[in-house]
């Protein structure tokens, strides 16, 4: 794990980079404040190069990432996990270019990182009301889903 201050438009975060041993992908983790007993505001987001970096309107235009930083800054403490994806999260074939889907392995990576940070009870930033299962095995509990 590498760590460094990260000044952003939303304030000064701490940036940690976790490297996945099986595939070498490097996952970015932005934290604001220190975890405590209160539930922590968390966003786990898959890499979306065309939306996050190039603001492609058909690819989410980075809105969820910016909204997540805004929400964490407003709350005063929280965590954003940016899960790296092969090919920047894109799938390209004869049918065109589209975003790949986040799968169970990506949730597992995010959960391992959150557990390593010492989080237990989280307020998950999401617009997807479906229940995320399997986090209990990492000692995590979603106490609230927060739309952005």
Enumerate the language-model features and the residues they cover.
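Catalytic domains of riboflavin
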Residues: 1-148
